[in-house]
Structure formats: structure tokens, C-alpha cells
Amino acid sequence: MLTAKQDEVGRELRVATGTSLIEYPVKDWLLRRQPTEWEALLGEAAIFSGQDELLWGPFVACVYREPRTTRLNCLFMDRIGVMHLHSVDVSDTSRFYPAVENLRPEYRTQVVRRCLAVGLLKKYVLLDPSAVRLIRAELPYDYDQTTAGDLANTCELVEGQAARDVGQLLVRLGLVQPRHVRSLMLDVVYENHADVVDANNKLVYYLGEQLEQLFDPLTEYSPEPTELSYRVPDQVRTSLSDEMPLMVSICEELLQLQTNFTLSLVGFLQKFLIPLRIKALNEQVPGLSTVKLNNIFPPTIDEVTRINCIFLDALKAALPYGSLEVLKACSITAPYFYKAYTRHEAATKFFSRDIKSFLSTFGKSLSDLNFYSEIKLDTLIHGPQEKLTKLKLIIDRLFDSKDWETNEEQKEADRCYRSICDVIDSFGKDEPPNTYDTRVFTPSGKILTELAKGWPAELQYKWLKRRVVGVFDVISVTDPESRDIVVIFSDYIVFLHVINGNLYYSGDSKKPLISDVLMNSLINEVPLPPKIPKLEVLSHSYIDDVVVSTYGKNSLRFDTLNAERPSSVAYTLASSSVEASYVADLCTKARILEKDTAFHLFKTAIDSFHVYSTAHESEAYKTERIKSPFVLFLNIPDSIGALQDHNATVGLFASLNKNDKVTLVRLGLDGSREESFASLDNFLSLIIEELLIFYPSYLSSATSPLFQQLMQINEQLVQTLLDPKGVHSASKSKCALRTSKKKKMPANLVSTNDNSRTLSPGTIISRTPRTISTITPKQEKRKSVGQASNSPARGSISTTPRKHKRESILGKISGLFHKKDKKENKRNSVGSDTRNRHDNGSVHILRNSSSSFRELESPRQMKRFSSVVHTAVPSSSKRRTSGISPSKGTVNLRALQDAENDDNADISKIPIPEGESLFDDTIRVDGVDADFYAQKDRLSKIYNHDLYGEVVPSAPGSKNVNVVSGATREQEKQQNTQKAIARELLASVDQQKRQPTHSAPAESQIVIPGLPQSNVPQINFGRSPSFIELFGGMRLVLDENDESVNWRRLCSERSLNEKYQIRPATYAGCISGELAPPVGIISDQRDSNLSGDNDADTPLPMHSSNKSILSDETLEKGEFERDFAISTPKSQTVSDVNARRETWGYSHSHDEEIDSEKRANTKPVSAPAPNVIPGLIITANSPTKPWHKENTRIKVSDVRSEGTDVSYISSLKKSSNRLVELSVNSQEDFEDERHTPVIEPIQNPEAPSLIENTETAPVASNSSNEETLSKLLGSQGVIDLTEETIDYSSINRKHASIQTAYPVLDDVEFSTFHMSFGDMKAEDSHLANQRESYLFSNSTIAGKKDESHGPVFYKLPDFVADDSYLGYSAVDQHAKHERNTEIGEEDEAMWVSPSKLDIFDLSKQPESVYKRTSIPAKHAELLSKMRKDGSVKFEESMFIRDNSYVYLGQFLSADEVIEQQDKKLAANTDEMDSARRL
């Protein structure tokens, strides 16, 4: 466990890894032994490796002779850590000797084997039994002397160099020496109440120094030490005087350039910057602090000046000895430019902007320093890198102009010249264009070149927030010859492997560290230089999951403690200028940067131990993601509920008393509570003590909530000890499989880490990984031996299609028309992609029971759009593993049934890499994907893939699907033992056999682009929010001759539809006289397509037809079979449809039957599809396609009242080639926990299953069908778009027949301005008494409240005797009802075209003509009455926007009936009202 230590150096967290996770008695001097002593002892030790299935797992045992006692000691490394056994007694007097008696006879004479047996028994006895139960709750058998002896018999001796390597790795991995955690984050929580503000401020004052910024450039900047410097040669070969005049001139030019630039930098520091710094420190410049000054003129300029001085000294020393020595001096000094210049560039990125503000603010205070103008300052700050280009040009001339005398000089000069060029080119050089899928976007959006192979998908987005904290060169402790890179971001830590890194660093010349080059690329947004070695990602971890500890000489260990994949990796820093504690401190700062809520920052530094305290407000802290397990609560009552609210393991509750004493209560989740008191001066010391007590137990003890993760990490370390390079290389190949070969992700891809339904442009899901169990190789071996006699030989099964070179477009198109060879088909279908078949180190088997598919963990598991489309199986569907016939892609259902009845059938133990399925092909029943119809949530298959991917995807279920050839009947039995799936599929097939008219063809045909399909998919499309927003306020159609852009819906206000029920909801209507059946009758079709599991969740098909409506030539049949439920198979005939119609109780004319039969028997060749529109049902969630339609007249309900998305009407005689864009459900509409759909599906949990209820229930009558469907449409949020014949209520049935007999659009001459009169009916007299006053008193207010949704045309109500234009009287309700019916019979709706109206006047008369127009006298009195009477009110708010058109009724002449009613009404008015109106 970890122990707290305080010594003369200071306080620190000491991780004593010499102890195990479970406490046991151990000698203290064993734990304090130095690493060098351990290396000497373990180098001579006898090392054994073993595997214990009961408790210890894989373990390593070291038996060595202790120098102090000359007796045998034993050291064990297993899943609970390192355990020391001192002075092991192997004599027969030992109480552990029975373990020796259980050894083999040949082992009983070996002392080391006897010590091993005794040690295995003794270590179990020393451990606390309650702690042993944490390893395994219940032991299947006792761990006793027999178990220990047998385990010692099975241990293998590690001999030779391997044994010495294990001993060294025990030290290098930090397993036998203390590890330290010197940097921690402490969360402080306070409540923002006025009564505790002062007390909180007093307490946080003692938490340390409050920091304004997390990174201080002054304290954290350290110049790079010059390890190599130029020295003049001992023996003089040549001198500058011996050179040609041209060479002398070039060398002197180089020296002069460097002299002038260096002197200008030195003068800038001495005359301007240093005096200005002194003034800022002395506060002589008002408002100018040191921090502000260093932001403008960063300290990096000092380092740049220092490097230039070193370079100038080297040139001066080398110049007398000739051009070759000048090149040597440049090659030795140039590498030191890199780090200084790149940091200076990053620090002065915004200097040109900041200097203007600086001079305008403080220019007057710098009057004595004004000889440096803005332009001169800008030139000096940005000058260093500009001078590098000039230096390179001069060196190029120097190297090219010299004729080297000997080959030795030529080689030496060439080496120096190449070294100089590589360094200067490392600052950034143009590269040829590269693909974007392996590039990374910088915070400003600039694209970098490929950083590394297998770049994690988690780091391909959020670059606007991500910051680069540090990049470091490291050396792996498992392979000292290997060079790696550690990149610390603000949210992730990435470990990169440098491919052939030893070659890059080999040689005499000093090269820039790859970490510095990478830092320059990330910070300054420049491409990587071409000479940098290739990098690949080893692993990456979220910053909050990583615990960094230091040990030895500049060594670090990164432990990832998440529940999913705990891991550990150890490195040694390659540069001696960087300390391991500094890297660990940066990781703590990165965690603080990842916080997403506001906080106050405090820092406490006690020697090498740093504590960063982040103070959060209590309510805001509840939403924080990055939290510390130990939380300090200020003036908050202690309670376990407070710990649970903030996800804290232990809380320290501090409250300030009146006498400035602090009461501290330490409370754990287990209820343990300790109380202590301290003064304010000792408050911080007491907090540090509590941290030193908590974190050792939290990071390495049996009581830690991370105990399981810690045990898994120890198991990995044991594997590393036994096979260090194998684990190291395996991790690389595993990562390459995960990121590079499995999926090359585009760098700008945004993924939801966690849901397969969230897609990104350019990708499709080609395969869903299965949830599979893992067993160890030893378990697999043991299980396979027991099954060897019962299992036949099993051939390899192809799981992925072979990936060929991408074909051209012409090749793809030509491949659709010629018949492929059988061998070619077999090769394409059975071939495997070996690049995708990598084993991750474990053997996978399938479970006995059907398991659910695992959702995609990350976008890495998505595949690019390929030439073979694999149907994505959602996570909600059950896994289907079926026996596949060698010749067909259909399911061998009888083999499934036999396997179900076979008691001896077992699941085959087939290794399956993660993310791959056993079979590529999904189960198909008569050419239809059964898995597709079992889905609960289907994805939209809209093409949003890579535009440069494969051109023509083949439909699933086509001839070239993957099949498994050569499988015997026994193999099929073993591969298909999922009983539930077999029963479901057999039931589905039996239903299809009972319904022969609905059987689909056994195999799908490839659809050639350009030919329409003859079968009609069931189309469900959803409402587009943008469509409703743009067209929700418009009305429908005027006349056919009008422009298509003017076709909007007239009439039928929402108030009329809803309030008076003019058009009640009815069943889905007919197309060309063909009526859709009631919903319940469709169950016979649906049963053949849908599994019974998902009846409640799958959208119901509402219409069936045998006519093709698709002429979108780019869409293939296979795609529609996946996108939409095909309710009508090819074999369905017109007679079948007619027979069903008669059953439903509907009929159509004989002419329509003949016409329908002709259309059904006509085979489409190249002509467009028939001019028929299918029954369309709007649902809340539906995919969208562009449809090219030639359709008949359709009556569509009001857009506003019914929520319709489409409004479109055409003539019977004239085809309209119009593309209708249906509503597109964007990616945000997919059901994802992080993406809320724009329109949620309307669920009706109370609605019974239609299929179950209607299969046995007979169809009673038309009215019952209508009632059933009306309820369904109301509950599902569905409206009728295709109804042609409307069955109105009995009171309006006569009016409905007239509308049907006289269609409103048949007469195209109604293209002038007409008013249409509806058939509104009043419900009560209260409405008539309130409308008149409301009409005029509120017209102004109503006009302000309601926005115009033009073009809008309105319909006036009937002018009957009891109407007051919009008001009704209750004189004779019965008579009014009869008049409404009569007028409905006589009048019909009249239509108007907006394109035929002048914007001001229809007759194009001047405005003065209408100014002279007066209101008829017979209407003047009534108009005056309506203006004065304020009692008239509207019950329906939708009438408000009709008010502005009421005045038009005054210009229409009324008939005699209306005049009589007006006179009668005026005679009955009392005298007071008459006087008031006059």
C-alpha cells in the first residue's frame, strides 16, 4: 500500500510498491532497499512463472539468498502486487512443510522448489481472510498445502538471459522501489450565502497563493542547455587565406549578417527592454505591471539573443580555418535555434496587434525610449526566423561554390550541410497536397499534416477547446532501444511510438527532439518536416483517468484507472533537462484545464509536493465532470448526502468557530467519522496530513473503490515481465488495428462516442460488433480438448470481403451488365480481408444464449463506403447466427430446427476479432432481410457518404453475397444453436406459406440504374421543420394553368375544420379509384415482413399498391428494401388486389379495373413509371427521398390545421414534371441520447396491436373500418393525403356529393377573382351576440398581434337572413340549417390565381375611381351598427386574420331574402338601441 512519509526534504506522497494491495507483515528494510541492490540480487535469483486459476492469476516468483541473513527469501508479483517473504524455512520442522510433501519426487530435493512451495502456502496464510474474499468471493475449493504443492509443480523456471531481464524489469517498472505522487488536485466546495462569506474567505486565505493563471511563462520557461559547442580543430589543415576569393567573400558575408543581427538584439535588450522591465518593477509606469510587459515582450527574446551570441562566437572561431570549419560550426550550433525560435514564435504570435495597443497606452511614459519605433520593434521581434532564411541561402552558396579537394572533405561537408538544412527546414516547409482523412485540425482550423497513424477518434474534434500542455521524448522501460512520445493535451494523454526512432537520433550531429518539432507543429500550426520519422499511436487515455507517479531517476508510470480498460505504462524521460516531477505536475494542470465550471485557483507548494485547490460554488459543482475523490467542504454541515451529491469518496468538512478555531470532520461514504480541531495557522498543515492519509489507501489498498482496476493493472505488469517486447509490439499492432486498418477516420469527423445511430458525412456503418465473451488461451485449450471428440474439423470461415483495388467508374458500370464467372463470384464472396483480422490477445467465443449487439463504441469502428453494402444491424435487435447454405444466401431453417432439437449441439469456439461478425451476410427469408424487419429503430439510408468512395454499391441479398462453402451438416448444427431465432424464422416462413400471394422472389436482382422498379415500397416520410417554418402559413392550389410556384392551398381555415368539423378524419383514401383497406386488414402482408418482436415499435404500412411510382433512377432496389417496408411483393396481381377490395367492402368501376390491369401487366422497359401516386402517410419520423411524380388530383388537408408537409395538386389530363422534396430528417433526428429529434414520434402506448386484433376479428362494415382507422390516425399523428371520395357527416352528405360530382378544378376558366362561400353553421346564440363588437373594436389590436402569412386568400361565410356578415342570430336555427344545406347545394367553391391579380386592382383602374365609390345605402346602416356594437366577440382566435376582408362583402349586392331579413331585424330592434346607433 502507499505510506505517508515526511523527511528532511519535505512532504510527499510515497507509493511503496514493495507492498501488496492487501496488508501483511513485512520488514521495513526490505522496502527501503535501493534499486541497484535489487538489480544485483535479482540477477542471481531463480525466477519462476506460473498461473493460478484460484486466487493469484499469472504470477512471477523470485527465490534469492538474502545477504544480511544468508537465508532464502521469496518475492512474488501477482494480481495483488509485490509480496516479500523473509527467511523462508524449508525444513521439515516448518508448519508449512506439508506443501513440500505435495511436490513431485524430483522437486523435493531442490531447495528453490521447496522454497517456492512453502512461499505459496505462507503468503496465503499471512493475508487477512476478509481481504482474500475481495480477490474472489467464494473459492470452489480450499487453498491448502495440496493446492500450494500442485501450483509449485506447475511453475516453469525462467532461465538464461530471460531471467536477468525479468529481474531488471522488476526494477525499471518501479515494482520494488517507492513511487511518488507529488502533485494533487483538491476540490473545495462552498455555499454562496451572505452569512458565511466572511468565514469562507478566511479559510480559503490559508489554502495557499491565489493564481490568476495556471501557467506562468516566467517561472516555467527554462533555456535549453548547450550540451555541444564548437571547438577549433587541434591540427590546422587549411586557412581562410588559402580559399578562393569567392569563398572568402561568402564566409565574410555570413559572419557580417550574423554580427549585425546579434548586435541589434543585444542593443534592444540593453537599451529598451531591460530598462523598461526595471521601470515596471519599480512601478514607475502607471498601469504597467511585469505580467503585462512579459505578455508583450516575452522572455523568449532573451533565449533567442543568447543562442545568436553562441552562434556568432562559433562563426568567429571557425572563420580563420576555412569554409569546412564554418559549415561544422553551423551544423553544431543550428540545432539549438529550434526550441528557442519555436517557443518565441508561439509567444509572439499576436505581437503586431498587441504592440499598437501598448504604444498607444504607454507611449508617453516611454519618451526616453522612443528611439524604437513600432516598425523597428516589429522587425526585431519577428526578425530571428526571417534571418534563418537568409542564413540558409548563404550556406547554400557556400556549399555549392566550393570544390572539395578530397572525398573525405566532400562527405564531411555534405553531412554538415544536410544537418543544417534539416534543422532549418524543420521550422516549416511546403509539402505536396495530402488527403484530409489522416490530418488533424488545429484550434484555428488550419490543417496539419498527418501526425501519427491511428490517430484516436476522440481527438479528431473539439480542437477549439483543446490545448497542448506538453510534449516529451521518452524511452520505454521495456525496450530501451525504442523511442516514444508523450503528448499531454488538456483532455487526453496520447502515447506515440517513433518508428525507427533510433535511426533518427543516431549520428554525431545533434538533431531537434521530435517532441520539440511536434510541439511547434501543434502550437504554431505548421506542417511536420519531411525528415521526421513516422509516428503511430500506442494508446490514449482521458486525463481524469490517469494517475502519474514518479520513481527512480526521471522515470514515470502512467496508470489508467477506468473501469473499461485499465492499463499501465512506464517511461524514462529522454532529456535530462526535464524532470519527471514537472511532467506529473503538467498532468495535474491538464485536469484543471479540463474543468468546465468556474472556480478560484489556489496553489500550495511544500518543497516537491504541490497541491492545487479549486474552489467551486456548491450548485455549480454538481454539474462538474472533473472532480477529486477527496473534497474539502467549507462551512457546510457534514452529511453522507453531501458526499453522494458531489461523487466524493471522502469529505473533509471545515467550519470556522467564533474564536477563529477550525473544526474538521473527516467523513467517508462508509459512515466512518473523525473529528479534530486546529487553529487557522495549522489549517493547511492538517489538510495536507489528511491528503497523505487518504491517497495512499485510495491508490493502492483493498479498501479502495479502484481495487478491481488495480488488480487488472498488476496482471498486465506480470505479462510485461514475462514478455516485454511482445506486449509492447502487441499494443502497437492492436492500436494499428483499432485506428489505422480498421478505420481511417477523417480528421474533421465529429462522433458521439457512444451511439451507432449518430452518423457523420462520409461514413456508413458496415458492420456492428458483437458482444462476445473472452477467455484465456489456457481456458480455450482446456475446453477445446473436451470437445475434440465431438466436434468435426472446422475450416476457416471468411468474415469480411476481400478488399481490392478501387475500380474506375466505367469498370463499375460495365460490371453491372456482364455475367461474372462463377469462380470470380466465389472469390469475391468467400474472400477475407486479412488486414482486418487481427487478434487482440484473447480468444473469443459466442455465448450459448442469443446476446444483443454491442453498439459502436466510437467512430473508429465505422467503415468507409465500400463496393459491397453491409446492412447495419442495430443494437436493439437480437443476434442471429444461422446455418448458411453453400449455394444460396437464404437461411437453412431445417438445419436450425435440427440444431434446436439436438441436445449435444454446442456453440463453436471460433476466434472472432473485436468488431467483426461471424457472417457478413444477414439472414434472408425469401430475399428479404429478416434482421432488418426485426429492427426497432431503423436508420435512414439517405446517401451521405464519401463522394469519392466506391461508385455503385451492390444490393444486399444479390448474387455476390458472402457465403460459406464446404460446410457439413454437423457444422451447420454447431454454428446455429440460437433456438429463439430459429422459432421466429420458422414461424415467419410458415405464415408466408399460408399466404402464397405475398411470397417474394428468393433472390434479389441487381437493379440497373435508369430502369424504374415495378414494385411499390411503403413510404413513410416525416415532417421537415424547415418546410413547416417556410410554408406553414400558406394555402393551397388555385388553378392548373398557373405557375407552379403559385400553387398553394385556398380555403378551409383551421377554425372551420376544427370548430365545425366540415372535414372529419377518415381512413387513408384511394388513388385512381383504388381504395386502401382498413389498417387491420394489412396484417397478412405485414406478417411476412416483420418479426413479432417489434410489432409495437415498427411503423405500420398504411397502403398497398402494385404499381411502381419510383422513377428516381439513381436509387436501387436493394436500398429501398432496407429503407422502407415493401408491403406488396412482385407476384401480387390485380385480381388479388380486387379480391381484397371486395373483402374490405369497397368497389371501383369496371373501366378502372381494366385500366389497372393493363398497367399491372405492362413491363417497364425504358419508359417512366405509371402516373400513379401511392398512398402516403405522414409519420413523425420518416426518411426522405426526392420523388419525381406525375400524379392525379389530390385533396390535401390544411397545412396549419393538420400539420401536413406537402401541398401539391395536378390535373388528370396534364402531367407535371415537378420534383417534390420531401422532408429530410437530418442526423440530429436520430434517436441518440445526445441528439434530441426535431419532431418526436407520437407514441400511443394504449393502442392495441392492430395485427393481433384484426387477424381474427371480421370486418363488420365500412363505418367500423372508418372508425377504427380514424382512431388510429388520430393517435399516430397521421393525416390523409390521398383521399378522393370523402364521407362527410350526415348533415353535410348532400353537399359532399355535389363537391365530388363537380370538382372545383375541372373548369379551368375560373381564373379570375372570385369569392367562395362556405357552409358554416352556428352552434349557439352566444356567438352571434358577441361578434359584431369584437370585429371592429379589436381589429387594430388583432392586426398587430398576427403576422401576415402571404399570399393568403380567405373565404367569406354564407350571406343568409340571420347572418350579420360574420355574426349569427338565434331567430330560427332550424330554418338556418335548411338554408345552409340549400346554399351548399347551389354554390360551389371558386378559386383565384395570385399571378393574375394586379397588386392593387383587378381591373387596372386608377385609385381615384374607387375613392368615389360609396357603400350601398342598404348596407350603411348595418355597417354603422357593427362598428358601434362592442358586444360581438369571437370564440375562435383563427377568425382574427379574416377581419380585414369583411368590408368586401359590403360591395356585393344582396338578394331579396337578405333584404327581408334585414328589415325584419331592424323592426325588432328596441328604440334605445336605435337612438344610440343614430
Curated annotation (Swiss-Prot):
PROSITE patterns: DH_2 (PS50010). The keyword ATP-binding does not apply. GO terms for molecular function: guanyl-nucleotide exchange factor activity. Residues 732-889, 1085-1106, 1146-1168 are annotated as: Disordered. Residues 749-761, 786-800 have a biased composition (Polar residues). It is found in: Cell tip; Cell septum. GO terms for cellular component: cell septum; cell tip; cellular bud neck contractile ring. Keywords: Cell cycle, Cell division. Residues 763-777 have a biased composition (Low complexity). It holds the Pfam family PH_BUD3_C. One of its GO terms (biological process) is axial cellular bud site selection. Residues 1146-1160 have a biased composition (Basic and acidic residues). Belongs to the BUD3 family. Required for proper septum positioning and septum construction during septation. Acts as a landmark to mark sites for future septation, and as part of a scaffold that recruits components of the contractile ring to the site of septation. Not required to determine the site of lateral branch formation. This is Bud site selection protein 3 homolog. It comes from Eremothecium gossypii (strain ATCC 10895 / CBS 109.51 / FGSC 9923 / NRRL Y-1056) (Yeast). The gene is BUD3.
